[in-house]
Amino acid sequence: MSFADAKQRFSNRVADYARYRPGYPPPVLDLLRTECGLRPEHVIADIGSGTGLLSELFLKNGNRVFGVEPNEAMRQAGEQHLASYDGFTSINGSAEATTLLNASVEFVTAAQAFHWFEPRAARREFIRILKPRGWFVVLWNDRRMEEAQLTRDYEGLLERFGIDYKSVKDSYPEVRNIRDFFESDDFVARDLPNYQILDWEGFRGRLHSSSFAPTEGHPNYVPMMAELERIFRAHQRDGRVRMEYFTRIYFGRLEGR
């Protein structure tokens, strides 16, 4: 898959993405305050800002945020969602070409977007827009498999019915990808617990928000939805299920050596 193709993958998923994707827990801010010295006056470039899930966390902290998003539909959804925040500026740009000024931000963040970047070009761009000794923070929500049968059943559904799930899953970042991106710069890894409580509508919407989930008319759609309903019925309590995640965070300074 080309990086250009990746930037359009979610165009027909925007409403479900905005409504049903998990956000990021407030302890993310506590961690960045403690480890990176995050303060409200710091400026954030949120790359692949999408519908604004991470941008909003920083805006509530008092930060000015540039939301850089290449997908028009996602960008418009983010603009609508964050319209009440004076500190938000929407940018039609990408990780490789943000359009931001040199040395203009203290933090570059990427939530659930790192695997869509062209790494070398993105690293050069981030070093350009970061102030000296600025921070790069990459994070994403990863479903917990070990002690949660629901997430294991859900994973099995994706593997069975997802259109190109394996290729997308193989592109998800691993520690070696993060290490390659930071090159000789040091970075730190942390995991924070996160979860969603979903009724049937939310559980369906969570699936439909994924770019690899077949849509109506695809031969996999009807059997996929039947299996999803079976999973929901098996795990629901009082009409709701709890989807468990880790919010995985990697952060470090980009020095440009």
Show where each model-derived region lies.
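Conserved class I S-adenosyl-L-methionine
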Residues: 1-42
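Tryptophan-centric aromatic hotspots in well-structured domains and transmembrane helices
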Residues: 12, 16-17, 24, 31, ...
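A structural alpha-helix within SAM-dependent methyltransferase catalytic domains
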Residues: 33, 56-59, 123, 127
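Class I SAM-dependent methyltransferase SAM/SAH-binding core
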Residues: 43-45, 51-97
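Conserved Class I S-adenosyl-L-methionine
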Residues: 51, 175-257
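A short acidic, Gly/Pro-enriched loop at the edge of an enzyme's catalytic core
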Residues: 96-107
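A short SAM/SAH-binding and catalytic strip from SAM-dependent methyltransferases
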Residues: 106-120
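Conserved catalytic/acceptor-binding region of the Class I
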Residues: 124-196
